[in-house]
Amino acid sequence: MSINVVQINSGDLIGRRFNGYDLKPYLHSHDVNSTQLVYWNKQSDADFVSKAFDYPGNRYVTRGFMQFEQKLSMHARIQPHSWTLPYHQKMRKADLAHLHIIHDGWLSLSALPFMSRLKPTVWTWHDPWAMTGHCIYPIQCSRWQHGCGSCPDLNLPFSMRKDKTAEQFAWKKKVYAKTKAEIVVASEWMCDMVSKSPLAEGFNVTVIPFGLDLERYKPADKAAARDRLGVFAGRPVIFIRSSSTPFKGLSEFVKAIEQLDSDIRLCIISLQETGHFDRFMGKHQIIEFGWSNDENLLLDAYAACDFFAMPSMAEAFGLMAIEAMACARPVLSFEGTSLPGISFAPEAGVSVPHGDITALARAIELLVRNPADCEGRGKLSRTLAERHYDIRDQARLTADLYKRVLSRDKRSGSVA
């Protein structure tokens, strides 16, 4: 008997590798029919994707409530349309709802008890926001373990004007106490956070790592990729996502490049934002893609590089890390995030103390000056990706979870 599941998310094609979009055909092989409801970024014309809310002026209304929440120093609490979501046709037809990115302002978490009473619910925590008083990542702060309040940084996303983090934390606790949902996280690092969170008490938690199509993400000819991208001959190549988001560690990486020995001449390939490496032009070759959804370009970048730098100050999983591993490239990261575990440092990946710029520079030099070691780490990374990050395994584990949840919950698949 097949299972009908609706994936509820902020967007479809943006984040498709972790929001259930790419998982659909693999779930189908396990008798799971998956559809999607999205809000901010519906880009696909596929018939299995629909807008969560489509009434006239809904975005103006949503943004208006978000601005009101910002003035009151709260987030994801009001949005009255949230209580109508269970009556959407795709929700009514589904046996189970799987929540993904629902915390970027368009949905009220206050509706979760109502929604989960009407429909068996799985909720993937893609980041720690569900466990904090306001921030997506608490970085080095531990107040999320004790109810928040006296917040050390209200400017972290999602920012607050006044410190109402303790109030927001207490509100979440009340909501969660009335919510029946199975929580999914993608890394042991996140699972460890969940085990320490007062807000997660009472929830069952399952770890399901994200996966890739390993026939698509695989080792490729380095020389050919470098020719296509125009890499100067003889240059060690580093690939990095250049995001100025405070969690991504770009400024730390730039400072580490400044500390490299003067004889090192690199090629730095960057994806997303441009201009961050202008100061190095003339010494290092800089190849900037800007923002791109071109998967072939991404695969060329992985093939061309010697290693992938992901110096995030906070990271709940790191999908680009496993993409690099699948392409036989080791990952360089900071400790204190999920990445050393995801990249299997120190055997395959390389990690350095959290925020230590000098240690990051020395690690870059070590990888650059020891190409045989770098290549060996890359080969091991591919082996580990095959063992742990196959999208077929993700689909199997996800389908098994759906079946377990439904076997424990005999409610009807309809809210009518």
Q: Which residue ranges define each predicted feature?
A:
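Aromatic "clamp/platform" in nucleotide-sugar-dependent glycosyltransferases that forms part
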Residues: 313
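A short, well-ordered alpha-helix in the C-terminal region of glycosyltransferases
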Residues: 366, 373-388, 394-400, 404
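Short hydrophobic beta-strand element within catalytic cores of glycosyltransferases
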Residues: 330-333
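Nucleotide-activated donor-binding/catalytic signature segment of Leloir-type glycosyltransferases, i.e.
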Residues: 275-299
